[in-house]
Amino acid sequence: MSGRPNHYWRYKIIRDPLYGFIGLTRREVKLMNTEWFTRLFRIKQLSHAFLVYPGAVHTRYEHSLGTLYVADRMAVQLGLNDHEREVVRAAALLHDLGQGPFSHLFDEVFKWVDKECDHEHLTKLIIENDETIRSILKGENNNEENDIYSDVLEILTPRKRFYKNKLLADIISGGLDCDKLDYLRRDSYHAGVAYGIFDIERVLNTITKDPRGRLCILKKGKDAVENYRLGRYLMHIQVYRHHTREIADSMFLRAVKLSLYNEKLFEDGITLAEKLTPNKNSIKDFLSFYKQLDDYSIYSLLKNPASRSKELVENLERRKLLKRAVDLDLTSGGEVRDAIDRLTLANMTEEEMDGLSEKIAKRIQEPSEYVIVRRVEIPIKLFKEGEILVYDEDQNLTDDLYRISTVSYTHLTLPTTE
């Protein structure tokens, strides 16, 4: 049972289109007023999906706020104490601080310059090195606020093998976490599609922990979670991997790649690749540069007259997109019949795809920047083993949703025709 009065959690309220009024603590308001957090206003949640779904112009800012709300509902449902509740709320609010321009798309850029770096690592780096955020999390200059800095930092550490409190970490990042529960419904709402709609109230009211302290769903909530999983799968197919969005994203990535090593972009002669590599700069210089990067500033940078990217980016702004010339299905039932050819195409490296683009461009006598070969994968399965646990109170047993679901893809059959 919570010990803090209700007004502590509702120092300020903000209206949200999905959840109505969301209460915030004084500490959370301070965090939202930092430069790093307000930067999220300028980073779209779904990169270039707005070129297909014009309503999908929502940002990481409102998603972070919604994630806090869902995390809090989970914390209360699980009976967390006040300290744990504050930790998961703050971690949920800050979980996307490290996102680059056009969100997850910029993780592709980091793969080219620093394979160890992505938005999750950068979130941790920002919290560790920003004095304002660190001071707020430590509760300095406020006797009413406890120190949650170390605990927030721990559960936001990506892919850590052991967590002091695994339950808190699973609320933030897991098969059924506050991040996914918010973005599926939020993305669906703004895109104007129904694929991501599921019964979130049923899910939140049947979340529990088993006797071993693992995050689970009660057996009676299994149907709602199956609907959530199906919605996630359909959103990837219909929205996140829509071919027009993929084309726009590919044009953006090509524009960045053309400018990465251009020594004329900046007056100091340092390339964009070097500025995006933390271990080649002081952390302070890197974060100072990265803080200024958002959807708008990266476009402005790439339109530098000295860059080969200028025309590509201007075409993106005008929605003059490249067209899909060839689309090959590399599954066993697709157009590529030979198994060896399928395997070769499916396992091409990025360098090999760039080389193929160059060859095609020469053959058809087009500028190489306007020929792009890209492999598109659906990163999730309808169900995945070990992702979501179901707890049966009557039997006191915990099982894997993958094994007991009646709609798991392993059980799907098609009716025979007579």
Which functions belong to the PLM regions below?
Residues E86-L94:
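Short alpha-helix carrying the canonical HExxH Zn2+-binding catalytic motif
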